From Swiss-Prot:
<dbReference type="InterPro" id="IPR021930">
    <property type="entry name" value="Heparan_SO4_deacetylase_dom"/>
</dbReference>
<dbReference type="GO" id="GO:0007509">
    <property type="term" value="P:mesoderm migration involved in gastrulation"/>
</dbReference>
<feature type="disulfide bond">
    <location>
        <begin position="983"/>
        <end position="993"/>
    </location>
</feature>
<feature type="transmembrane region" description="Helical; Signal-anchor for type II membrane protein">
    <location>
        <begin position="173"/>
        <end position="192"/>
    </location>
</feature>
<comment type="similarity">
    <text>Belongs to the sulfotransferase 1 family. NDST subfamily.</text>
</comment>
<feature type="binding site">
    <location>
        <position position="877"/>
    </location>
    <ligand>
        <name>3'-phosphoadenylyl sulfate</name>
    </ligand>
</feature>
<dbReference type="GO" id="GO:0005794">
    <property type="term" value="C:Golgi apparatus"/>
</dbReference>
<keyword id="KW-0325">Glycoprotein</keyword>
<feature type="active site" description="For sulfotransferase activity">
    <location>
        <position position="768"/>
    </location>
</feature>
<dbReference type="GO" id="GO:0008587">
    <property type="term" value="P:imaginal disc-derived wing margin morphogenesis"/>
</dbReference>
<dbReference type="GO" id="GO:0030210">
    <property type="term" value="P:heparin proteoglycan biosynthetic process"/>
</dbReference>
<dbReference type="InterPro" id="IPR027417">
    <property type="entry name" value="P-loop_NTPase"/>
</dbReference>
<dbReference type="GO" id="GO:0102140">
    <property type="term" value="F:heparan sulfate N-deacetylase activity"/>
</dbReference>
<protein>
    <recommendedName>
        <fullName>Bifunctional heparan sulfate N-deacetylase/N-sulfotransferase</fullName>
        <ecNumber>2.8.2.8</ecNumber>
        <ecNumber>3.-.-.-</ecNumber>
        <ecNumber>2.8.2.-</ecNumber>
    </recommendedName>
</protein>
<dbReference type="GO" id="GO:0007474">
    <property type="term" value="P:imaginal disc-derived wing vein specification"/>
</dbReference>
<dbReference type="InterPro" id="IPR037359">
    <property type="entry name" value="NST/OST"/>
</dbReference>
<dbReference type="Pfam" id="PF25119">
    <property type="entry name" value="HSNSD_N"/>
</dbReference>
Length: 1048
């Protein structure tokens, strides 16, 4: 049956065949007047009318279902003939608006077979009127459903709906049909594994690697035995430091930034200088400070003033230091322009294509010649070099872009144009490598690294060994339709074998969550089984049982219980449990460190190694580092451009070209080039569907073999971690950052932790300068609170400067209560819940070598408060402090013996000497703090003024800290005659002073020691005066003036 709505009237009525046919009206109350058209043949109107009556009777039986009981009539007007063909009668008519609704006179048609059954090809169109009831053919059509021959339960439902559709409200009918449609979609996508529908899913679009090298066969082996990469090392490297001096046009120039980032990525030390200024110091005693000089703009070198040019050239000749220069783009196009003082000519502002390398160049080491980078090169501002002297040799060639510059004649052969040039130094004794374009072209990045190696005589050479490990996270985790099938597992094994031929020892590393085993479709469950049947083919590591984030657990027992479930699953399915490696879902709990995770890992899995992309931050990738915490080595993890949702090549963000760009010289390629040890994160979904991970890693490894001399290999995680920390021992200690400063970190940090409780300012010492008195005065303020006292170090936490730092951030934060807690020791009333200024006082922070870096990482916005007194007086006070506490060395050696102890003295004596003398090098330590904190966050207190006039000192400190309300210390501090210093006034007649150990009177320092210390600190005190003047906000203390006047 077909019922459809139209919007036109048939005015070609043949009135002589018009009849009225009464039929019981359908329940929904619509009256239909039909107009018959499309006449084939019909001569007897009465016979046709009878046929119509019979058909409508059958129609009402089918769709009225006994409910068409109203007295209204269906009026059918026969105009022209009734079409009858193949047992089907078709009526096309228009509504006359009879019934309860307001008909709009739309054309309608009804098709029935003579048996009263719907035709095998069924479509239903429904029109609605404007009244509360709905009518057949009473307005614009609003919906429909089409289908083919009924099959199974779905078609049965459709027939049932069709038969009852005219016995209920049409709007409900539409909703029912939509519901059936949604149910059918859900059924087919979640429960049907085979058949026509499943075949519609694109599963045969697996991209194949297209990287082909002329020098490498299909098995990843070089066709001819390639000569080993040249060794640039020579004895000249012994006279220079492994550091690069980079001259830039401005501190914000783009190429200068690219150069600096490339050096950072490869951990090459460098110094940036703005060209045009005076040269920095180039030598240190008899050694050159820099191994290579780099000019972002070659013109800055060529046009350097005579004095600086001669100094620089003399340094380069004397220490065999080379120069790298880049031809800077300019608006003026040069043709055959000669470089100043050199028999060298340049053409600029060219568009080029098809770059290749000179296989005879002695510069190349990391980079392999023999291939061509086909296609247009980036940019339209290339410079090419022309020369006629034997000192010059091309390193890189390119062709003119014929699309931009057509050849003069058809078939003309273009000569290669030199885009990177080596100057052997035959003219002036200085070797150079000149680039005709920036680092936008990926090949220039490799050649630039080779130039640094060559010009520094191997001092800046990179190791050519690269380790690659590919983790496959989320095994058994994934929605239906995204998981692995048996064919995917076979492809995984086959690809692993192919990669292993190019990367010795390579095996995929699979991380599993056992809870979701057999949670796919039937075929995907077979894939799970097939994966476990081949468990021996891979390396394995544990995720969490249900892929939970560990930082959400505050109970160690529960966290361990979840791990035990995954462990039991591994045992039941013969998965190895001794890898010593684990990955936390979403890297939760690794960094920021969740201490319970590290504890549970050790107890359940005996984890020795993990990895994360979050330390210290996800971006920029060049700054990712490793660390060791609780004897678990944490390695930096790399991304490869594939994530859980990137499963199909045609849906890859940016398209296939974007992925290929990353592989062929882009981000993924450069990640492996720059990192000696690479652990890549992928997911199970990347190995199903289009198997993008297999395509990606096969392609990038082949591309690496085409263009580099890198030696690729793989090893288990524990072995990689040991190698990593041998290469980078400076990364063993972690640096705890503030989780609230990184949105990603905050998401994987416990919700029970709050950065607001961290201290807003630090009192850093040094020791024996009055820090305890300052601590006491600050605690009197109602809006200021300090940490909870430590059972070991009392009011000092001593977190940033000792072994406490390795206990982790959680341990440190436990010392700081909620900032809303009242300060019960304060005489100043405070309201519960008012803002609090938390602070920490640890006098050992001042001269701690690692303290400024560590504190700035966690508390970058904190204010820093320090107290300075005469360094000689401070040294003597520390010695007497140790004597009073029964220190054996202090009681057995005089002060003079201690401060004059040699480096060959007993270790304990040297330690005491250092603790007496080193903190007094004030300028040196302050400069260290100012390397991390701006001067605006540093407040220096004159220790003598704190002792003699604490009220003014405390008022000034409150203004610096911007604390409200201000506390009037004149009402709370009183000079105590017996103690000889100010104390807290608790009543009119009683003071609360520090203990007996504070303010102790010592014997006067002997004159010999005093003179020695005045000479010892002379240069340090002079530097302090210069620093204070530079800061400009502090007057020169009187004790400093006295020390300098006496010393002279």
């Amino acid at each position: 049956m077909t019922i459809s709505g139209g919007n036109q009237h048939n005015n070609n009525a043949n009135r002589k065949y018009e009849k009225l046919i009464k039929q019981p009206q359908m329940q929904f109350g619509s009256s239909v007047t039909g107009t018959q058209t499309d006449v084939d043949s019909c001569r007897d109107a009465d016979a046709d009318a009878n046929a119509v009556r019979q058909d409508f009777s059958n129609f009402n039986k089918h769709f009225g279902n006994g409910h068409a009981i109203t007295d209204r009539t269906m009026l059918l007007r026969l105009e022209d003939d009734v079409t009858t063909a193949a047992g089907i009668v078709t009526y096309k008519g228009k509504s006359n608006g009879n019934g309860n609704g307001n008909g709009n006179g739309s054309i309608g048609s009804i098709s029935l077979d003579f048996n009263g059954s719907p035709t095998s090809s069924t479509s239903i169109g429904i029109a609605s009127g404007s009244s509360s009831n709905t009518h057949l053919a009473s307005g614009g059509g609003v919906g429909g459903i089409g289908g083919s021959e009924p099959a199974g339960w779905m078609c049965h439902c459709c027939n049932l709906i069709a038969r009852r559709c005219f016995g209920i409200n049409v709007r409900r009918c539409v909703l029912a049909l939509l519901a059936i449609t949604m149910v059918s979609i859900f059924y087919y996508t979640h429960y049907v594994d085979t058949g026509v529908f499943n075949g519609l899913i694109q599963r045969d679009t697996h991209p194949a690697p297209i990287i082909n090298c002329r020098m490498i066969n299909s098995g990843g082996k070089h066709i001819r035995n390639a000569s080993p990469a040249p060794d640039h090392r020579s004895e000249a490297r012994l006279r220079i430091d492994p550091k690069v001096l980079v001259f830039v046009e401005t501190t914000y120039s783009g190429l200068g930034r690219d150069i600096a980032e490339l050096l950072v990525y490869n951990r090459i030390k460098y110094k940036i200088e703005v060209a045009g200024k005076s040269l920095p110091v180039l030598t240190n005693l008899d050694k050159g400070r820099y191994g290579v000089i780099v000019f972002e703009n070659l013109d800055k070198y060529l046009n350097m003033d005579k004095w600086n040019r001669e100094l620089l050239d003399k340094y380069c000749r004397e220490y065999s230091v080379g120069i790298v220069g880049f031809v800077s783009p300019s608006e003026e196009t040069l043709v055959g322009a000669q470089l100043r003082d050199f028999p060298l000519f340049v053409n600029t502002n060219l568009r080029l294509r098809d770059a290749s390398l000179n296989p005879l160049s002695s510069v190349l080491r990391l980079t392999r010649a023999g291939e061509t980078a086909w296609g247009a090169l980036p940019g339209d501002d290339w410079a090419v070099f022309q020369h006629n002297h034997s000192t010059y040799e091309p390193v890189e060639w390119a062709q003119r872009n014929t699309q931009e510059y057509p050849a003069d004649s058809v078939g003309q052969v273009q000569l290669p144009l030199t885009t990177v040039l080596q100057d052997r130094g035959q003219l002036d004794g200085i070797q150079r490598v000149l680039f005709g374009s920036s680092l936008r072209f990926w090949l220039h990045r490799l050649v630039f690294l080779d130039a640094l190696s060559y010009l520094s005589h191997g001092q800046l050479s990179l190791n050519l060994e690269r380790m690659i490990l590919v983790d496959i996270d989320d095994i058994f985790v994934g929605e239906k339709g995204t998981r692995l099938r048996p064919d995917d597992v076979r492809a995984l094994i086959a690809t692993q074998k192919n990669i292993a031929a190019m990367v010795p020892g390579f095996r995929f590393n699979l991380g599993f969550s056992g809870k979701y085993y057999h949670h796919g479709t039937r075929e995907e469950n077979l894939g799970d089984d097939f994966l476990l049947q081949n468990v021996q083919e891979f390396n394995w590591f544990s995720h969490m049982w249900k892929h939970q984030q560990p930082h959400l657990y505050d109970n160690l027992t529960l966290l361990m219980a979840e791990m035990h479930l995954n462990y039991a699953f591994a045992v039941d399915h013969n998965i190895p449990t001794d890898s010593g490696y684990s990955i936390s879902p979403h890297h939760s709990g690794v960094y920021p460190a969740h201490e319970l995770l590290y504890m549970a890992w050790k107890k359940v899995w005996n984890v020795k190694v993990t990895s994360t992309e979050e330390y210290p931050h996800l971006r920029p990738a060049r700054l990712r580092r490793g660390f060791i915490h609780r004897n678990i080595m944490v390695l930096p993890r790399q991304t490869c451009g594939l994530f859980t949702h990137t499963m199909y090549i045609d849906r890859y963000p940016g398209g296939r070209d974007k992925l290929d760009e990353s592989i062929q010289g882009g981000e993924l390629f450069q990640t492996i080039v720059y990192n000696p040890i690479n652990i890549f994160m992928t997911h199970m979904s990347n190995y199903g569907s289009d198997r993008l991970a297999l395509y990606t890693f096969q392609s990038v490894i082949k591309f690496l073999q085409c263009w580099t001399n890198l030696k690729l290999a793989s090893a288990p995680p524990v072995q990689l971690a040991e190698m990593y920390f041998r290469l980078h021992p400076e990364e063993v200690d972690p640096v705890w950052g503030n989780p609230c400063d990184d949105v990603r970190h905050k998401k994987i940090w416990s919700k029970t932790k709050n950065c607001d409780s961290l201290p807003k300012f630090l009192v850093i010492g040094p020791q024996k300068t009055g820090t305890t008195a300052l601590y006491t005065f600050l605690s009197m303020h109602g809006s200021i609170a300090s940490n909870i006292a430590s059972p070991e170090t009392f009011e000092e936490v001593q977190f940033f400067n000792g072994n406490n730092y390795y206990r982790g951030l959680d341990w440190y934060m436990d010392f700081f209560p909620s900032e809303s807690l009242p300060n019960t020791s304060s005489p100043m009333p405070t309201q519960l819940g008012s803002p609090r200024f938390m602070f920490e006082k640890s006098a050992t922070y001042f001269d701690g070598e690692a303290v400024p870096k560590r504190s700035h990482a966690l508390l970058p916005h904190a204010k820093i408060v320090t107290i300075l007194i005469s360094p000689a007086k401070r040294a003597y006070s520390w010695y007497q402090h140790q004597r009073s506490h029964g220190d054996v060395i202090a009681n057995n050696y005089s002060f003079y013996q201690v401060i004059t102890a040699s480096d060959s003295a007993p270790r304990a004596l040297k330690d005491l000497r250092n603790r007496c003398l080193n903190p007094g090098k004030y300028a040196q330590h302050l400069e260290h703090w100012l390397a991390y904190y701006p001067a605006q966050q540093l407040h220096i207190i004159d220790g003598e003024q704190l002792r003699l006039n604490p009220i003014d000192v405390m008022n000034e400190l409150q203004r610096f800290l911007k604390i409200q309300p201000l506390l009037d210390y004149s009402n709370h501090l009183r000079y105590d005659v017996k103690k000889g210093f100010y104390c807290q006034a608790v009543s009119e007649k009683r003071n609360k002073c520090l203990g007996k150990s504070k303010g102790r009177q010592y014997p006067a320092m002997d004159e010999r020691s005093a003179k020695l210390l005045q000479r010892y600190y002379l240069n340090h005190n002079t530097a302090l005066v210069k620093l204070l003047k530079k800061l400009g906000s502090r007057p020169i203390p009187q004790w400093l003036k006295d020390d300098l006047s006496t010393g002279t």
